[in-house]
């Protein structure tokens, strides 16, 4: 197995003491005097196809190889089945609290390379789209009569940020682990609405950022939610730091599904480029159902899993229960 470690510029950091495997060491820029690396400064010579794994240390190598901007968000995680993110250990000198995160990332990276950890992807029989009324009714009935869990996860995909400015494209739902669907809103009629409301009356409904989703379900369908939860607010109980509460961030940190929206993000970027559209002008109604369904369904799957984890943790801590 061939492994490479890439840092921003050559340094004296002893990475060998953190890993028990051999690796080749590279620098994105060979000039160690550079403080800020520009595109023209990158002179690394590496054939990434010759390596099974690339450990990317710090934000510059991470951004160069993955086109992602936040190495902290992906710290210790896998991207594109090849790249492993690691925060720069130099930051521990002025931010000692980062040591725990660094050590956990080292353990995670070692696990991926050894094969003990794997990024999971659900099959089409577990995560899929629905555009048929009978199938929606069957799914909702199964959700109502499932006695193993007293909650469901619910998410919405919309054409705009504000409910008065657009329409709901579809909703995602999960009523059991590792099983989620994305339903096209075109199949919602009076029968489906009645069945959905029955479900909402009988079980707790879990959102991630309920402030957003509630307005859409209430404004466009007049749904009522007698008992709902919010995994975003729950996470604030554990970590009040800003920028750490998004669903994607939490999925990467707390689940084995990782950055499951990566392919969707790539599709959007390609669409913008091919059609000459600015990102600010893009809306989700431009994404075909067949492209959207798998990723939207995963939102509900992840929300369901996060709620299980967070509620269990809260129940074990009397100081966090309300």
Where in the sequence are the language-model features?
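Acidic Asp/Glu-based divalent-cation binding sites
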Residues: 61, 213, 299
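Conserved anionic group-binding/transfer micro-motifs
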Residues: 54, 206, 299, 303
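Conserved RNase H-like, two-metal-ion catalytic cores of nucleic-acid enzymes
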Residues: 5, 17-26, 120-253
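Metal-dependent phosphoesterase core characteristic of DEDDh/y 3'-5' exonuclease domains
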Residues: 66-75, 79-93, 102, 106, ...
């Amino acid at each position: 197995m061939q492994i490479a470690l890439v840092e921003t510029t050559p340094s004296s950091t002893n990475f060998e003491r953190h890993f028990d495997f051999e690796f080749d060491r590279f620098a994105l820029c060979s000039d160690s005097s550079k403080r800020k690396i520009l595109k023209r400064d990158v002179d690394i010579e590496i054939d990434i196809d010759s390596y099974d794994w690339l450990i990317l240390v710090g934000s510059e190598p991470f951004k160069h190889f993955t086109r992602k901007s936040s190495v902290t968000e992906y710290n210790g995680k896998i991207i594109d089945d090849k790249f492993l993110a690691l925060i720069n250990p130099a930051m521990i000198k002025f931010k000692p609290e980062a040591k725990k995160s660094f050590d956990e990332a080292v353990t995670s990276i070692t696990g991926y390379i050894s094969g003990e950890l794997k990024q999971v992807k659900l099959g089409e029989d577990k995560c899929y789209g629905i555009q048929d009324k009978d199938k929606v009714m069957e799914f909702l009935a199964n959700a109502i009569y499932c006695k193993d869990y007293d909650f469901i996860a619910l998410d919405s995909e919309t054409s705009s940020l504000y409910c008065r400015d657009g329409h709901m494209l579809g909703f995602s739902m999960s009523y059991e682990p590792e099983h989620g669907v994305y339903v096209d809103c075109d199949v919602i009629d009076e029968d489906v609405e009645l069945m959905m409301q029955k479900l909402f009356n009988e079980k707790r409904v879990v959102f991630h950022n309920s402030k957003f989703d509630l307005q859409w379900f209430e404004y466009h369908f007049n749904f009522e939610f007698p008992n709902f939860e919010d995994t975003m607010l729950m996470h604030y109980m554990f970590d009040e730091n800003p920028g750490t509460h998004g669903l994607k961030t939490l999925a990467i940190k707390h689940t084995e599904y990782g950055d499951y929206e990566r392919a969707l993000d790539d599709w959007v970027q390609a669409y913008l480029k091919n059609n000459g559209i600015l990102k600010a002008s893009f809306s989700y109604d431009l994404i075909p159902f067949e492209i959207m369904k798998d990723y939207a369904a995963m939102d509900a799957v992840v929300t369901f899993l996060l709620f299980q984890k967070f509620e269990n943790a809260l129940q074990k801590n009397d100081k966090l229960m309300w």
